[in-house]
């Protein structure tokens, strides 16, 4: 099975060219002026073609909270936002703290067969931050462990977790929050645990990825320890670069313009590695009761384009690096650029078309961006060489 994309405006971390793309058996075979006969030919008509976006931080709520989202609706929501790969957090019900639940999620995702799914496993049993799981027995397919949704406040426990994860050559995704300080200051809570975990990464050699970094001091700490060659990476969310001084409940909290300015600076100097959505679906009742989080897969690119490119003159090449290449590198996958032999995970974007945020493919609609207008319409998403989503087609429920 082969697919030819004609008249593409190709943009990845290095390229900004007009060319054709030949896809064969799920891989990019060649780039150039291509005239050979193919099973399927799509004229892109000079729209932008980028590597599919990779979300390092997603909640699909399966198992246990399928009233908010499930693997199918989450995957369609991802495709509608140009995402071809999602890395799921383990704070489900029951918690992903054993191989049985871990493989159940992967098996079901493979049956649905829409996007590439990776799944994190918890670091402690039932996410209670008391008893470590048996890391030696954890499935070797696991890329990262995570206690996402809460920090590991006990420093001795954190040290032991980092040490055990380093032994098996895996990584940890850290939700930096010292819960002893949260009621005093969510800023202090994030900063203190970020500084501690940077130090532990340096001393243990454990690969640490910091989730949803939102403050000046946390970013400065990450920069400082990166310069000491600690094996750390970090992500920021679209809502933390777009919203300021808002009471919309997310964790970590929405910060100030000064924090946003620092995030932009740290994107430009390469301290920030990735943009990740922290897509967190909730029902209206849960939000009314104070649940933290928002959906983000279907608006992430638009916000990144507006804030980074239109307002701060950051190139689409850099946005591709943040949303595709670096996340692929962090996961250790052959994705994220448009080169021969790489996975044919692609998104086609009409960058001149305006969209108005309204209906979502997600089961939930807990978004503060409803009614806002952005440039950039996701027209088609291709996963492993197959068209999995087309705007307005039968699986687009907006």
Residue ranges and their predicted role:
Residues 8, 26, 46, 57, ...:
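Divalent metal-coordination and catalytic microenvironments
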Residues 1-36:
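N-terminal metal-binding scaffold of metallo-dependent hydrolase/deaminase domains
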Residues 34-50:
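Active-site metal-binding motif and surrounding structural segment of the metallo-beta-lactamase
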Residues 130-275:
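Histidine/acidic residue-rich metal-binding segments in metalloenzymes
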Residues 107-122:
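A glycine-rich helix N-cap at a beta->alpha junction
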Residues 47-109:
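Metal-associated gating/positioning segment near the N- to mid-region
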Residues 8, 343-395:
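C-terminal cap of metal-dependent C-N hydrolases
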Residues 188-205, 268-275, 279-351:
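His/Asp/Glu-enriched, well-ordered alpha-helical/loop segment
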């Amino acid at each position: 099975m082969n697919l030819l994309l004609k008249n593409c405006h190709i943009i990845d971390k290095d390229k900004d060219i007009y060319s054709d793309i030949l896809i064969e058996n799920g891989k990019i075979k060649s780039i150039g002026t291509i005239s050979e006969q193919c099973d399927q030919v799509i004229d892109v008509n000079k729209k932008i073609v980028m590597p599919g976006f990779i979300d390092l931080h997603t909640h699909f709520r399966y198992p246990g909270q399928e009233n908010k989202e499930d693997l199918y609706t989450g995957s369609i929501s991802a495709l509608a936002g140009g995402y071809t790969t999602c890395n799921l957090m383990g704070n489900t019900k029951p918690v992903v703290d054993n191989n049985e639940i871990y493989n159940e999620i992967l098996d079901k995702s493979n049956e649905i067969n829409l996007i590439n799914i990776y799944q994190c496993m918890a670091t402690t049993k039932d996410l209670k931050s008391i008893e470590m799981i048996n890391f030696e027995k954890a499935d070797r397919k696991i890329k990262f462990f995570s206690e996402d949704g809460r920090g590991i406040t006990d420093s001795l426990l954190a040290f032991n977790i980092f040490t055990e994860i380093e032994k098996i050559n895996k990584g940890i995704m850290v939700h930096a929050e010292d819960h002893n300080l949260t009621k005093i200051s969510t800023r202090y809570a994030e900063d203190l645990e970020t500084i501690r975990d940077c130090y532990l990464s340096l001393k243990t050699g454990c690969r640490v990825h910091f989730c949803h970094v939102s403050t000046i001091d946390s970013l400065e700490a990450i920069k400082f320890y990166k310069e000491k060659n600690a094996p750390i990476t970090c992500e920021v969310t679209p809502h933390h670069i777009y919203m300021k001084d808002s009471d919309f409940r997310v964790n970590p909290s929405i910060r100030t313009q000064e924090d946003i300015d620092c995030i932009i600076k740290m994107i430009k100097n390469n301290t920030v590695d990735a943009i990740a959505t922290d897509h967190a679906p909730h029902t209206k009742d849960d939000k009314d009761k104070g649940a933290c989080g928002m959906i983000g897969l279907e608006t992430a690119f638009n916000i990144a384009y507006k804030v980074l490119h239109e307002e701060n003159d950051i190139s689409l090449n850099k946005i591709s690096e943040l949303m595709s290449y670096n996340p692929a590198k962090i996961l250790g996958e052959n994705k994220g650029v448009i080169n021969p032999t790489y996975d044919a995970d692609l998104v086609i974007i009409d960058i001149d078309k305006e969209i108005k945020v309204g209906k979502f493919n997600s089961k939930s609609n807990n978004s503060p961006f409803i009614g806002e207008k952005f440039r950039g319409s996701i027209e088609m998403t291709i996963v492993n060489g197959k068209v999995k989503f087309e705007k307005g087609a039968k699986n687009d429920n907006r």
